[in-house]
């Protein structure tokens, strides 16, 4: 009876498709019979392939999750046949590309079809307020664009291309290798046509035959309100141009936010601090404080204690994707106690201490403001 397929691949039961594929690639490379000659490696390799065969397909995975092996055993072979690898064959080409590319001998795909362009990454820095409120920003990128002279063909205008004689248009060259486990085809990219299956008669002078040119471009992008460090924005079709009529890739903009001297951010809340005098703390007052929306008046209640936190509702960061909802602005009150007072102030404070029935010493007033002042 086969073991648990999740345990065989070393993944959790809630692993996504990419995690399962990565685990399979790692284990298949390790236990492939052409690589691992240890006893039991072949059997382990078959288990790994069976596990991937079941877990890589949503339908069979769902049956396995619900009924176990009984849900997938009907009509499914217990062994693994190299000639019927399905999507696994594509992974094999990737896994063993370092060994010259190992295939199954059944694939003869041409590589002359459209190829999507690569995605690109751009790191972009915002100041604190730009991250809070968003807005439109201009960026500059360098990417590959389709050559306007040859329209992406790579051929000099008025000339064409012919089928590569080295690979007969397949874009691949193969070499059969016999092993104790059967005959395998080692596959590599054709060195003559670089995998295109065609050879250009005369290269385009503008792009050197590649069909694409490196260009610098200015773009305006919209920064949504409430972004934070690590927020990723996708700009469709602004990556590298595709090849042979393929679509362009996408541009991914990764945002970072500069620190602010006055404000700190915690989730969608903003934090700041202000200092008031001990008299303002005792008597209370009205003050103007800075917020990301501008100055705002707050009330310091009489008897406010050090480290009191005042909350300004809806003065924080807009929630990403729902800018109507905002966090709060939390203001910590620091009370400044003077280290020295002049004689007149001291006399008044001593009278206050006497009224309150509190003692004081040479080093300062004890009790209400005890031990806080020095001559």
From Swiss-Prot:
CXXCXGXG motif repeats lie at residues 147-154, 164-171, 190-197, 204-211. Signal peptide: none annotated. GO terms for molecular function: ATP binding; heat shock protein binding; unfolded protein binding; zinc ion binding. Its cofactor is Zn(2+). It comes from the Bacteria. Zn(2+) 2 binds at residues 164, 167, 190, 193. Binds 2 Zn(2+) ions per monomer. Belongs to the DnaJ family. Participates actively in the response to hyperosmotic and heat shock by preventing the aggregation of stress-denatured proteins and by disaggregating proteins, also in an autonomous, DnaK-independent fashion. Unfolded proteins bind initially to DnaJ; upon interaction with the DnaJ-bound protein, DnaK hydrolyzes its bound ATP, resulting in the formation of a stable complex. GrpE releases ADP from DnaK; ATP binding to DnaK triggers the release of the substrate protein, thus completing the reaction cycle. The J domain is necessary and sufficient to stimulate DnaK ATPase activity. Zinc center 1 plays an important role in the autonomous, DnaK-independent chaperone activity of DnaJ. Zinc center 2 is essential for interaction with DnaK and for DnaJ activity. Homodimer. HAMAP family: DnaJ (MF_01152). This is Chaperone protein DnaJ. It comes from Gloeothece citriformis (strain PCC 7424).
């Amino acid at each position: 009876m086969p073991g648990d397929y999740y345990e065989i691949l070393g993944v959790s039961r809630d692993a996504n498709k990419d995690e399962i594929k990565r685990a399979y690639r790692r284990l298949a490379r390790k236990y492939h019979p052409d690589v691992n000659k240890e006893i039991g490696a072949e059997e382990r390799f078959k288990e790994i392939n069976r596990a991937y065969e079941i877990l890589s397909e949503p339908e069979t995975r769902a049956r396995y999750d619900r009924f176990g092996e009984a849900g997938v055993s009907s009509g499914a072979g217990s062994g693994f046949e190299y000639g019927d690898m399905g999507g696994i064959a594509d992974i094999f080409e990737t896994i063993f590309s370092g060994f010259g590319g190992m295939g199954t001998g059944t694939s003869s795909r041409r590589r002359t079809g459209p190829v999507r362009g690569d995605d690109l990454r751009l790191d972009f820095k915002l100041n604190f307020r730009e991250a809070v409120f968003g807005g439109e920003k201009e960026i500059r990128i360098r990417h590959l664009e389709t050559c306007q002279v040859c329209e992406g063909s790579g051929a000099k205008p008025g000339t064409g291309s012919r089928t590569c004689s080295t690979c007969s248009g397949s874009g691949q060259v193969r070499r059969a290798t016999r092993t104790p486990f059967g005959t395998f085809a080692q596959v590599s990219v054709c060195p003559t046509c670089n995998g295109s299956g065609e050879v250009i008669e005369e290269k385009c002078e503008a792009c050197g035959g590649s069909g694409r040119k490196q260009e610098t471009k200015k773009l305006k992008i919209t920064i949504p309100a409430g972004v934070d460090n690590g927020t990723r924005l996708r700009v469709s079709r602004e990556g590298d141009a595709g090849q042979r009529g393929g679509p362009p890739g996408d541009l991914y903009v990764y945002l970072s936010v500069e620190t602010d001297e006055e404000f700190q951010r915690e989730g969608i809340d903003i934090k700041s601090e202000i200092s008031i005098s001990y008299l303002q703390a005792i008597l209370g007052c009205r003050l103007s404080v800075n917020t990301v929306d501008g100055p705002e008046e707050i009330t310091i209640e009489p008897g406010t204690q050090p480290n009191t936190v005042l909350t300004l509702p809806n003065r924080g960061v807009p929630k990403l994707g729902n800018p109507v909802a905002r966090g709060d602005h939390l203001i910590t009150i620091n009370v400044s106690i003077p280290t020295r007072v002049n004689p007149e102030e001291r006399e008044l404070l001593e009278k206050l201490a006497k009224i309150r029935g509190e003692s004081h010493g040479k080093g300062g007033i004890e009790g209400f403001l005890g031990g806080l002042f020095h001559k």
